[in-house]
UniProtKB/Swiss-Prot annotation:
Keyword annotations from UniProtKB, A to Z: Cell membrane, Membrane, Transmembrane, Transmembrane helix
Location in or out of the cell: Cell membrane
The protein, known as: UPF0060 membrane protein SH0717
Lineage: Bacteria, Bacillati, Bacillota, Bacilli, Bacillales
Similarity field: Belongs to the UPF0060 family.
Record carries keyword Membrane: yes
A GO cellular component entry from the record: plasma membrane
Positions of transmembrane segments: 5-25, 31-51, 60-80, 86-106
Keyword set includes Membrane: yes
Protein topology in the membrane: Multi-pass membrane protein
Domain of life of the organism encoding this protein: Bacteria
InterPro entries: UPF0060 (IPR003844)
């Protein structure tokens, strides 16, 4: 279980970080090198997600989606200095509950 959490967190950092670098390039007019580096990091995200131990693509990405939402809010708070409001927090909690429902039960 700790391995799965680690992979989710690493994938999230790559997806959010890579996307953020592309955002800086295209939306804020920063260097195209940031866009290139962001693209490479996003490719790493695609590879890292395959290290999950879950047997199916759909379940991995569905569960990861909830983790991505929470990590995006944390990123917004730390990097963009934008605190989540109560609706953001309620929505994130609902997502994490959904992730737990998907990944915690043992399946045969």
């Amino acid at each position: 279980m700790l391995y799965s959490i680690f992979i989710f967190l690493l994938a999230g950092l790559c997806e959010i970080g890579g996307g953020y670098l592309i955002w800086l390039w295209l939306r804020e007019g920063q260097s195209s090198w940031l866009g290139f580096i962001g693209g490479v990091i996003l490719m790493m995200y695609g590879v890292i997600a395959t290290f999950q131990s879950f047997p199916t693509f759909g379940r991995v990405y569905a569960a990861y989606g909830g983790v991505f939402i929470v990590m995006s809010l944390i990123w917004a708070y730390i990097v963009d200095k934008q605190a989540p409001d109560k609706y953001d927090l309620i929505g994130a909690c609902i997502c994490i509950i959904g992730v737990c429902v998907m990944i915690l039960p043992s399946r045969t």
